[in-house]
Amino acid sequence: MKSERKAEIIAVGSELLLGQITNTNAQFISKQLAEIGVNVYYHTAVGDNPERLKRAIQVAQERSNFIIFSGGLGPTKDDLTKETIASTLGKELVLNEEAFESIQEYFRKTGRDMSPNNRKQALVLEGSDVLVNRFGMAPGMFIQENDTFYMLLPGPPSELHPMFENEAKPLISEKLGLKEKIVSVVLRFFGIGESQLETDLEDLIDAQTNPTIAPLASDGEVTLRLTAKHEDEKETERLLKETEAKILARVGEYFYGYGETSLVREASKALRDHGKTVAAAESLTGGMFSEWLTDLEGASSILSGSIVCYTNQVKQQVLGCREETLSSHGAVSKECALELAEGVRKLTGSDIGISFTGVAGPDTHEGQPVGKVFIGLSTKDHTDVFEWMFTGSRSGIRKRAVKYGLHHLLNLLKES
């Protein structure tokens, strides 16, 4: 066995090449493999064509020694992944009785007749380790031929994700003889750019060995993935905590959460933890702030209400923004944002009022440039207004405004 696994992911399905779906499976698998120290060098997508798939396999065999396939394990004629791999490797397909019984049981429970082609899903490569599919019909497979690993996974993410985490990942670790415990933690930051964060942590990043530090910028946020390995799991955790403490000592003011969380999820949690409610006056954002909150469970306990106050008439008549403020300073102003935040808080009886006013484009407004944004945040004791200048598309500016509003709301709750 070679000391290093060079992995390649081959996604099978013409729908990928037609742009009908996005290949999120490759992203997920790459991330999961990185957590156990397996490097992915290539992503390949190929349509439902046996000749082209066979050629893709041959190319992968020349440059990779761990080839993972996703898709093409279904019952229809265009599902040809395992047949093509069997032909390429000179293997037979054999019926897996356990998988076949599971398929039959599914049809019995649903009261449907099983068509003959469903039996095809229970066929596996002879000599392979079978990966149980608890959320679908087609089992996965793992087989080693000479020094190369081959893994076959179903295409639907709802089946692939649990199969990989519960079946494939432990099996890969076993096959690779991994003794070290590899643990990762993701730190999430907002309000600081990737370049500034890397500058502030330059010496830590330059000296990284164990744990490794991997920055990633995405949609106005920055994440740091810390990955440590050691045979003693407690030592792995200690290494991570030690490095995390050094990082947060420098840029902790921008840190908001771990793992796959988000600003809206953390802000919602903070509102619940503090027993507070928020109400929104949304001019620029047009209801986006409240939409993001209500996408999460339990929003009724934290969101009192939201007013989409796009016109000056609604700003005045519903939220009490003074005519003098609008005529002297305009709707896109610090003064207007302040009165809107206070107005919606008082109108709804909420603990916190938040307001959004600005210019999303494409044209300037009342002398204010595209991207100028004011966010008001009001409590019974104090009202603050934050001024920002964003760039990007109309929708991008609105999304950025909501994120910064959540950022300011979260900071307010942390300080209280």
From Swiss-Prot:
Note the InterPro entries from the entry: CinA, CinA-like_C, CinA_C, CinA_KH, Competence-induced_CinA, MoaB/Mog-like_dom_sf, MoaB/Mog_dom
Pfam families, sorted: CinA (PF02464), CinA_KH (PF18146), MoCF_biosynth (PF00994)
Enumerate the SUPFAM superfamilies for this protein: CinA-like, Molybdenum cofactor biosynthesis proteins
SMART domains (alphabetical): MoCF_biosynth
Known NCBIfam families for this protein?
Answer: cinA_nterm (TIGR00200), molyb_syn (TIGR00177), PncC_domain (TIGR00199), PRK00549.1 (NF001813)
State the family it belongs to: Belongs to the CinA family.
- Know the name of this protein? Putative competence-damage inducible protein
Gene of origin? cinA
